[in-house]
């Protein structure tokens, strides 16, 4: 983006906002509170301008950290995430934050996530390895558009741990194949779970509204 054009207004009265929600492996901290308050200010300001606000804030309730934490505490991942999710809801309420229009969980959107990964595979943007399915960042020209960086710069400075089969070290997991005794769901690629970066796909009953 050039930062040379002033964005005067939204093209329609309806404003759709996606907010990356919490990964619920531990209680909320001040960073979560800051994010909630900043976006709550934005929501209220847009409502003041007369805009119809549609807000999607996901809850990531399956993740490597969640699995690790549940094993540490000797509880199931679902018990852990249920309790921590309640703490987040209570924290948002204590901060007097407006509730989002949609607040779905990863585990409630497995079918939608799988369908979208299939589409990315068909477009040759996603590929399978022995550990899961990954997003090829070199196949999407707008991947770093907001950061102002280039793919070449990103790859030249990468410090991500190498995973066998990945085309680029910075490619991220869309679907992770499950290890022994890990929670998992059936998929065309084998038993596994969604990758952390796929969270946008479970933002609403119509995820495409937020992925266009």
What are these regions (language model features)?
Residues 60, 138, 178:
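Anionic group-transfer/hydrolysis microenvironments
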Residues 130:
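Nucleotide/pyrophosphate-binding catalytic subdomain
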Residues 133-136:
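Minor-groove-contacting beta-hairpin "wing" of winged helix-turn-helix DNA-binding domains
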Residues 19-23, 179, 208:
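Short, histidine-centered active-site or binding-site loop motifs used for metal coordination
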Residues 1-127, 144, 152, 158, ...:
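N-terminal Rossmann-like or analogous alpha/beta NTP/dinucleotide-binding catalytic cores
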Residues 202-212:
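Single conserved hydrophobic/aromatic residue that forms the stacking wall/gate
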Residues 1-2, 141-191, 198-201:
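NTP-handling and nucleic-acid-processing catalytic cores
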Residues 96-100, 185, 208:
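Short, surface-exposed connector motifs at secondary-structure boundaries
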């Amino acid at each position: 983006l050039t930062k040379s054009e002033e964005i005067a207004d939204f093209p329609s009265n309806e404003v759709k906002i996606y907010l990356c929600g919490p990964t619920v492996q531990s209680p909320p901290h001040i960073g979560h509170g800051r994010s909630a308050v900043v976006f709550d200010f934005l929501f209220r300001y847009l409502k003041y301008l007369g805009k119809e606000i549609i807000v999607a804030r996901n809850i990531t309730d399956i993740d490597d950290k969640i699995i690790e934490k549940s094993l540490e505490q000797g509880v199931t991942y679902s018990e852990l995430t249920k309790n921590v999710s309640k703490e987040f809801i209570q924290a948002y309420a204590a901060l007097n934050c407006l509730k989002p229009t949609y607040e779905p969980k990863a585990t409630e959107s497995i079918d939608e996530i799988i369908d979208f990964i299939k589409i990315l595979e068909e477009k040759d943007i996603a590929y399978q390895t022995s550990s899961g399915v990954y997003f090829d960042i070199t196949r999407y020209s707008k991947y770093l558009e907001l950061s102002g960086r280039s793919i070449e710069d990103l790859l030249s400075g990468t410090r991500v741990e190498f995973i066998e089969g990945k085309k680029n070290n910075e490619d991220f997991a869309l679907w992770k194949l499950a290890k022994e005794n890990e929670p998992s769901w059936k998929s065309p690629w084998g038993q596994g779970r969604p990758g952390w970066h796929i969270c946008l796909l479970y933002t609403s009953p119509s995820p495409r509204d937020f992925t266009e």
